[in-house]
Amino acid sequence: MASVSISCPSCSATDGVVRNGKSTAGHQRYLCSHCRKTWQLQFTYTASQPGTHQKIIDMAMNGVGCRATARIMGVGLNTILRHLKNSGRSR
């Protein structure tokens, strides 16, 4: 059986990563025993994927409208507005 090495997105550790149940959609969740962060590799909703926030900010800075951004990315208008509203705060 082949094993796949999964690294923690927070601390980049590979040796302390263990499976940690499943999400409500049935996707495998993982837990890093070093930093105690949990994550999953697959997402059901597009807005939950890593990098979505930065894509929304980049599109806004390039002059793409909110409704067009929502349509292109496949997320709701309120999601776009929430990301833009929270972009001024430090993440």
Swiss-Prot record:
The keyword Translocase does not apply. One of its GO terms (biological process) is DNA transposition. InterPro entries: InsA_HTH_dom (IPR024431), InsA_N_dom_Znf (IPR003220), IS1_transposase_InsA (IPR051252). The keyword Nucleotidyltransferase does not apply. Keywords: DNA recombination, Transposable element, Transposition. Absolutely required for transposition of IS1. Belongs to the IS1 elements InsA family. This is Insertion element IS1 5 protein InsA. It comes from Escherichia coli (strain K12).
